[in-house]
């Protein structure tokens, strides 16, 4: 046994309450080192009568390690536990202090989950597990009211998008096309920012309490939210709390009054006057963008202002949650207070952070419910679209992430394949719809909440920003009807089978130098086998004996 690789800690993703009665236990071992792993678990006050060996299953594997998991339901909501590691006939018992060659005589030195306190259980909104999101960039979705068009608005779709052009998209345009969303089958919408700003993307907020007049007003948003709710569609708005815009009145005051401004501590200012020297602003910003000064969210007045805005739009319009821009650059303390305020306003609100990398520190139940799952995006693109990862590497990329988060976080992770910040999926696939369909099929049959970027379903293409922000095509003769029907099919498939949303996931085939995968999604009602060939040539796969016990074991698939 390679005991140096064995790892467990009684916290985070290794030992956590999945709900009010169940604890999930995980342990890491060297890849292919153990033939079996068990948790020995029981009540410390009734150890002799309650201790049992619980078999652990292999949750995931990466290049170096296997990750094992089991579920225990302690009758009194507390559990003492250790692990039995087995390599053939060799056995080791792992306690909190050491490895033993014999079973521990008493539970004193075992690990402990002291008590499942309901208030401490990380519980994302249940509805998100069943959600299928559709992302809308409002300025480019539909122009429903030409009276609010900004000066210089171009005719719809008459030119390629630029960083500064406007086409007149607005909230009324979304209202006018809700039938399209219902026909597609989505049940949640995420809007990029709607609040008053100078740009077409609105990530430079001027007023956090006003809908940009270009899009409509608060009443229009309220009408849109109500109409969406009537159709069973949830609504998520974008909050830009890392930075404001240059026209944000407190920043304008600092520009005007400098050291005398009562708002100078609302921002991270290194020197006055505010200026840009050799391309670097004298104040902190998003990236080095002078139009986006970074907010000091530790300042009590800033904190109060932003938290009031977060609560205001939930109470005034009934939105179902927030997506948080540049969330990883804002303090954890602020996000903890944000969660408290938002969940008080709507306990069922979904809090989604924009974090592009490993995110476990935000997913412990005190900050976000989920993050935008770009590591998932990268894995899917590497395997299906760019074909720079083989099946084994693909499974490793996903396995490492799956083992890194508690299950309830994985169930609501925001799984996207493209967005307003990336090239469109069809463009990345070089127009190959076969690749695109495989990627989408995996997205809809994997853990997490899938999101469709507006227009993907009708064949919209486009490179990186601003190319990915084209006007939505509303001429149905130009729609890719085959692609639209495919999206409808995978949406119906996911909605019809709970196993695809919350069931277990297991790769059956994901081999080195292979472009074929097979995996199972399984719950008490369904066992769903998914087989994909990401190669132009045909292949035959066989489910190996012992990989799964059931009717499909030993099946040959061509």
Swiss-Prot record:
CDD domains for the chain? AmyAc_CMD, E_set_CDase_PDE_N
- Where is Ca(2+) annotated to bind? 143, 168, 170
What is its cofactor? Answer: Ca(2+)
How has the protein been applied in practice?
Cyclomaltodextrins form inclusion complexes with many water-insoluble compounds that have applications in the food and drug industries. The capability of this enzyme to hydrolyze cyclomaltodextrins is of importance for the release of substances from these inclusion complexes. This enzyme can be used to modify rice starch structure to produce starch, which has a decreased amylose content, or it could be used to produce starch, which is free of amylose altogether. Cooked rice treated with this enzyme has a significantly slower retrogradation.
| Free-text activity regulation comment from the record | Hydrolysis of beta-cyclodextrin is inhibited by Cu(2+), Zn(2+) and Ag(+), and activated by Ca(2+), EGTA and EDTA. Activity is increased over twofold in the presence of 5 mM EDTA. Competitively inhibited by acarbose and methyl 6-amino-6-deoxy-alpha-D-glucopyranoside by reducing the rate of the ring opening step of the reaction.
Q: How is the cofactor bound?
A: Binds 1 Ca(2+) ion per subunit.
What outcome follows a substitution of residue 388 to E? Decreased activity with starch as substrate, but an increase in beta-cyclodextrin hydrolyzing activity compared to the wild type. No effect in pullulan hydrolyzing activity
Q: Where is the active site?
A: 325, 354
Catalysed reactions, as listed in the record: cyclomaltodextrin + H2O = linear maltodextrin; Hydrolysis of pullulan to panose (6-alpha-D-glucosylmaltose)
Which GO molecular-function terms appear in the entry? calcium ion binding; cyclomaltodextrinase activity; D-glucose binding; identical protein binding; protein homodimerization activity
Q: What InterPro entries does the database record attribute to this sequence?
A: Glyco_hydro_13_cat_dom (IPR006047), Glyco_hydro_13_lg-like_dom (IPR004185), Glyco_hydro_b (IPR013780), Glycoside_hydrolase_SF (IPR017853), Ig-like_fold (IPR013783), Malt_amylase-like_C (IPR032091), O16G_dom_2 (IPR045857)
Q: Where is this site: Transition state stabilizer?
A: 421
Name the Pfam families for this protein.
Answer: Alpha-amylase, Alpha-amylase_N, Malt_amylase_C
- For this protein, the parts annotated as crossing the membrane are none
Keyword terms of this UniProt record? Calcium, Carbohydrate metabolism, Glycosidase, Hydrolase, Metal-binding
* Record function comment: Hydrolyzes alpha-, beta- and gamma-cyclodextrins and the resulting linear maltodextrins, with the highest activity with beta-cyclodextrin (cyclomaltoheptaose). Soluble starch is hydrolyzed slowly, but it is nevertheless preferred over pullulan as a substrate. Is able to hydrolyze amylose and amylopectin, with a very strong preference for amylose, with maltose and glucose as the main products. Maltose and glucose are the main hydrolysis products of cyclomaltodextrins, maltodextrins and starch, whereas panose is the main hydrolysis product of pullulan.
The family line of this record is:
Belongs to the glycosyl hydrolase 13 family.
Subunit structure, interactors included: Monomer. Depending on the pH of the solution, exists as a monomer, a homodimer or as an assembly of six homodimers forming a dodecamer, which is catalytically the most efficient form of the enzyme.
Its name, as the record gives it, is Cyclomaltodextrinase
Native source species: Bacillus sp
Source organism phylogeny: Bacteria, Bacillati, Bacillota, Bacilli, Bacillales
